[in-house]
Amino acid sequence: SDDDGTVVLTTSGPI
């Protein structure tokens, strides 16, 4: 999420 490369189910930045 949020500018990192983690897979999180949010409407943040690049997953």
UniProtKB/Swiss-Prot annotation:
Cellular component GO terms, alphabetical: extracellular region
On modification after translation, the UniProt record reads: Glycosylated.
Principal subcellular localization: secreted
Source organism, top-level taxon: Eukaryota
**Entry keyword set:** Glycoprotein, Secreted
Indicate where this protein resides in the cell.
Secreted
What does the record give as the function of this protein? Rathke gland secretions may function as pheromones, as predator repellents, or contribute to the maintenance of the turtle shell.
Q: What is this protein called?
A: Rathke gland glycoprotein
The species this protein belongs to is Caretta caretta (Loggerhead sea turtle)
Task: List the top taxonomic levels of the source.
Answer: Eukaryota, Metazoa, Chordata, Craniata, Vertebrata
